[in-house]
Regions:
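The feature marks proteins involved in alpha-glucan
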Residues: 1-27, 48-52, 59-146, 153-158
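C-terminal accessory region downstream of the catalytic core in glycan-modifying enzymes
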Residues: 484, 557-591
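Carboxylate/His-rich catalytic cores and anion/metal-binding grooves
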Residues: 176-208, 372, 376, 380-384
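Active-site neighborhood of glycoside hydrolase catalytic domains
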Residues: 235, 242-314
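Conserved alpha/beta catalytic core and glycan-binding cleft of carbohydrate-active enzymes
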Residues: 106, 113-116, 277, 290-449, ...
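Carbohydrate-binding surface patches
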Residues: 26-27, 34, 513-565
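Aromatic- and acidic-residue-enriched carbohydrate-binding clefts of CAZyme catalytic domains
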Residues: 158-165, 196-245, 258-275, 385-409, ...
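C-terminal beta-strand-rich structural cap/linker in extracellular carbohydrate-active enzymes
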Residues: 30-32, 75-76, 589-621
Length: 621
């Protein structure tokens, strides 16, 4: 036992990393590859006391060092390690001391600056989650929304107190509810340093800002620069509690580099799931231990989004089927983008992904995400415009499956504005009227633009900050999105727990899903066709009595006449909504009054019909 002033330090056989209180004592456990020396430095919050403890002799097994510190009469303290003269932060630190200004690098030569950025903070404060309960929303009922915490509300137009912070998300909860959003997915919100260290120690010498945060970090801490208050831990928990109270789940994106230890990955996910009560994770990185995560006893009920799951691996596949794992891939995105712009040969893929909803192969649908064009830019640019990134426009994806509607970039030409507005509505229909689970990227609901930048990883400015000031057109898109998400929410037939089979297996007279074009019950998916009608039979809904829907998609640049599947004598087709103009909408209504045999679906438009009971007609005697 080593006695240091009034402290007693003894060896521990603990293998739980980090710091925890054990009675009146504190247990410190860490793992370092030590060549010469390892020192634990503890100080009080006012920096009036500093204690340096050589801990080389407290090696437990392998690289693990563990010690018990008795007599440390501090409820709160700061600490860090010095390994072979290098100042290091505890990889398992739960709180940080320093809150920097986002985007402002620190000096790598000034010792005080280095210490301040590597000091962990420990306190025994408890947080009251009150009666918090996870919403536990069925995957088929989720309407998800991906956002960057800072970019979501940093712009002055957000009109929130906590701009760019977790508090700002709390303040926007009423907005989520208006959009019928019940799950948000946060881009990296753990503590990461926005710059990478280089040999040249100056602001100019640092690499460009990593605004997104897909990099290693202090995985057990929330990002303090995203906190409005000094207490990022409590503010994050306040956010979780408020979201849950509103019936909204929270998914955290966690990026792990290839050299991240698998034990740390599991410990990290467990900690956020149990301590912060998040609902799940989107785990990202080059070497993710998918099988280990899926098989973890603590995480078995957490929602886990994993990129490009290997469905050829039998062991992975069996775990995938039995857990709450969701496969994230770009298949839906590419298929819908190609169909939207009217590519030859795109109909087959559209039909496949529109119906894809296997309970054994859960996926998430999106047309845009953080990486790539926004929805507005998807219909405004055919080429990326990443010059502001400083890489001569060489970064970012060159293949975006986009169409600028005739003019590259911003346009005030009325015909272009109308066509782009129509295409955005069409894209939203492709997303929210498909089976499966939709995810909207922040700002797409009101035509946010990144000015053609499809890789704004280093932009902390108006390119990535949502501008909440709406014009007449963006208000129209926002209103349409709210209507569409409400329609989806209230039409269970659009988000069932099963994949539709194109069969009449309950013998009600119609299959659960059927396809139509110029002739009812017949469809030709040839390469030159870019139009299809899809009927969803209401008797196959969970309740068994929902309205039957007939959704026609015409992404061709010409009008097409669609046959209407014949209904029972007591029913008739009525228009729910269309992405066509008001004048064209009136023509469709007139067509339906004149005949229930066919309708004209105008070029580049979607029409949604439902079967309703015919009104009773009074007979005059």
């Amino acid at each position: 036992m080593l006695e240091l002033n009034y402290l007693s330090i003894s060896k521990s056989n603990n293998t739980q990393y980090g710091v925890f209180k054990q009675g009146d004592d504190y247990v410190f456990t860490c793992a370092f590859d030590v060549k010469d020396s390892l020192i634990l430095v503890i100080s009080d919050v006012k920096d009036e006391i500093e204690i340096k403890i050589p801990i080389d002799e407290f090696k437990y097994y392998g690289k693990i060092y563990s010690l018990v510190v008795s007599g440390l009469n501090l409820k709160k303290f700061k600490y860090y390690y010095i390994c072979d003269d290098v100042i290091c932060m505890d990889p398992y630190a739960k709180k940080k001391c320093l809150k920097r200004t986002f985007g402002k690098p620190y000096s790598y030569t000034d010792e005080d600056s280095i210490i301040a950025n590597n000091e962990a903070f420990f306190s025994t404060d408890d947080y009251d989650f009150e009666n918090d309960k996870r919403p536990l929303i069925n995957h088929s009922d989720v309407i998800a929304y991906e956002l960057h915490v800072r970019g979501f509300t940093k712009h002055t137009s957000s009109k929130v107190k906590g701009k760019g912070c977790f508090l700002g998300i709390i303040e926007k909860i009423p907005y989520f509810l208006e959009l019928n959003i019940n799950q948000i997915e946060l881009m990296p919100s753990y503590d990461f340093y926005e710059f990478d260290k280089t040999d040249v120690i100056s602001e100019e010498g640092c690499e460009k800002l990593n605004y997104w945060g897909y990099k290693s970090g202090n995985y057990f801490c929330p990002k303090y620069e995203y906190s409005y208050s000094k207490d990022a831990v409590s503010e994050f928990k306040d956010m979780v509690k408020a979201l849950h109270k509103a019936g909204i789940e929270i998914i955290m994106q966690m990026y792990f580099s290839s050299d991240t230890k698998h034990t740390l990955i599991i410990d990290c996910l467990r900690y956020w799931y149990t301590e912060y009560r998040v609902d799940g994770f989107h785990v990202i990185g080059p070497k993710i231990p998918s099988e280990l995560i899926m098989n973890d006893d603590v995480l078995i009920e957490a929602k886990l989004l994993i990129n490009n799951i290997n469905k050829d691996d039998y062991d992975i596949l069996s775990l995938y089927k039995s857990s709450k794992v969701i496969d994230v891939n770009d298949g839906f995105m590419v298929a819908m983008r190609r169909f939207l712009k009217g590519d030859s040969g795109s109909l087959n893929s559209f039909v496949y992904y529109n119906r894809l909803n296997s309970p054994d192969y859960r996926t998430i649908n999106y047309i845009t995400k953080y990486e790539g064009f926004t929805l507005n830019d998807l219909v405004s640019y055919e080429r990326k415009h990443n010059e502001d990134n400083g890489e001569n426009n060489n970064d970012g994806n060159d293949e975006n499956f986009s169409w600028n509607c005739g003019i590259e970039g911003k346009s005030a030409k009325n015909s272009i504005v109308k066509l782009r507005t129509r295409q955005i509505k069409n894209a939203l229909c492709l997303l929210f009227l498909a089976q499966g689970t939709p995810m909207l990227f922040m700002g797409d609901e009101f035509m946010n633009t990144q000015k053609g930048n499809n890789n704004p990883y280093c932009q902390d400015n108006d390119i990535t900050w949502l501008n909440w000031k709406l014009n007449k057109t963006s208000e129209e898109i926002l209103s349409f999105t709210k209507m569409l998400t409400s329609f989806r929410k209230n039409s269970k037939i659009l988000h069932q727990n099963k994949e539709l089979m194109n069969m009449d297996y309950i013998q009600c007279g119609n299959p659960d899903i059927s396809y139509h074009q110029e002739m009812a019950w017949k469809s030709d998916l040839s390469n030159y066709h870019i139009h299809i009608g899809i009927m969803l039979e209401g008797q196959y809904s969970e309740s068994g009595d929902e309205d039957t829907l007939y959704i026609t998609y015409n992404m061709h640049w010409e009008n097409h006449v669609f046959a209407l599947p014949r209904l029972k004598d007591s029913l008739e087709w009525e228009l729910v909504f269309t992405t066509a103009t008001n004048e064209e909408s009136e023509e469709i209504k007139a067509d339906l009054l004149n005949s229930q045999d066919e309708i004209c679906v105008f070029k580049r438009s979607v029409v949604v019909l439902r079967a309703k009971h015919r009104p009773l007609r009074r007979i005059n005697k």
